[in-house]
């Protein structure tokens, strides 16, 4: 299933858990030189990436896996003696609009992912908790279609994301207990990979990257209005780095293209690629970006 050898993945995960992750917080001090282990729930809200979706030989378009960023985040905290009880309630294709009004493939009307999240938070108000919110990209996706970018669509959808995400977070924060931490998840642009072998698609990649940057700006402003940090996934994928590097099988490309090829399925041949979802290493990179935003309890 993977496009990275198992031994490399295992080594990378070990490094990510032990060395690369900065020890930011799910451990609190109860006295001089003493750490008190922390147990907390982890509510994972979002779309397909929140579920670790990747293409497989059985489902080339993608299926849920246990190698998503939530899984790596739980493993990284476990390596530090921290127990996160993971609850994944995301749904592939989820948008902020569907989150509010329903109509996805996972929750029968009148239920929604938002209702599921609110019910969960209400029943865990006296617990430590971590909530990640991974929304927005699917709202933008209809504007990035068949290697064309629709600026009017982008503007309209970003305004919708701003309104809907604000409403979603307000409801979540209202029912969450006092010891619940929220972290927003930013986005990378998988379509950057389209620029390496086709001049026409290179123009599309440029505009798609512009649209994703604006999406992240909107998300960041909404999260900041609630004093919620946002994981800088775009930076983890080096979206702004255009330094030329050599990639085996591809040649000389900008570093942002190389990163997307290394961290997603976009540069893989059929039937597994091209696919916009992260691979194991990509999900590890997202997990690390989230980890960097976790503050001490």
PLM ranges: what are they?
Residues 84-94, 229-238:
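Acidic carboxylate-rich catalytic motifs and surrounding loops in phosphoryl-/glycosyl-chemistry enzymes
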Residues 2-34:
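Secretory targeting and sorting signals
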Residues 287-297:
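Short, low-complexity, Pro/Ser/Thr/Gly-rich segments in the mature regions of secreted, periplasmic
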Residues 53-67, 95-108, 152, 156, ...:
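Acidic/histidine-rich helix-loop elements
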Residues 16-25, 65-72, 185, 189, ...:
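Hydrophobic alpha-helical membrane segments, chiefly transmembrane helices and signal peptide h-regions
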Residues 108-276, 280, 284, 291:
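Alpha-helical cap/lid subdomain in secreted, periplasmic
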Residues 35-93, 131:
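Serine-esterase "nucleophile elbow" of acetyl-processing enzymes
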């Amino acid at each position: 299933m993977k496009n990275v050898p198992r031994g490399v993945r295992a080594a990378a995960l070990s490094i990510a858990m032990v060395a690369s992750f900065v020890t930011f917080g799910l451990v609190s001090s109860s006295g001089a030189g003493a750490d008190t282990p922390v147990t907390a729930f982890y509510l994972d809200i979002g779309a397909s990436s929140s579920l670790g979706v990747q293409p497989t030989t059985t489902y080339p378009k993608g299926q849920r896996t246990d190698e998503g960023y939530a899984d790596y985040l739980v493993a990284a905290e476990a390596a530090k003696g921290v127990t996160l009880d993971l609850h994944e309630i995301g749904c592939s294709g989820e948008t902020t609009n569907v989150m509010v009004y329903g109509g996805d493939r996972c929750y029968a009307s009148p239920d929604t992912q938002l209702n599921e999240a609110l019910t969960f938070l209400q029943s865990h108000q006296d617990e430590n908790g971590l909530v990640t919110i991974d929304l927005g990209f699917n709202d933008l996706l209809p504007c990035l279609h068949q290697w064309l970018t629709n600026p009017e669509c982008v503007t309209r959808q970003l305004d919708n994301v701003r309104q809907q995400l604000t409403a979603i977070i307000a409801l979540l924060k209202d029912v969450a207990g006092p010891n619940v931490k929220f972290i927003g998840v930013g986005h990378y642009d998988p379509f950057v990979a389209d620029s390496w072998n086709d001049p026409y698609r290179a123009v599309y990649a440029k505009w798609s990257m512009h649209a994703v940057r604006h999406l992240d700006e909107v998300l960041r402003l909404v999260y900041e209005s609630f004093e919620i940090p946002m994981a800088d996934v775009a930076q983890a994928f080096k979206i702004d780095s255009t330094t030329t590097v050599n990639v085996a099988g591809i040649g000389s490309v900008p570093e942002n293209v190389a990163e997307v090829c290394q961290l997603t399925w976009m540069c893989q041949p059929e039937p597994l690629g091209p696919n916009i979802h992260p691979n194991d290493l990509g999900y590890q990179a997202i997990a690390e970006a989230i980890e960097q935003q976790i503050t001490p309890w």
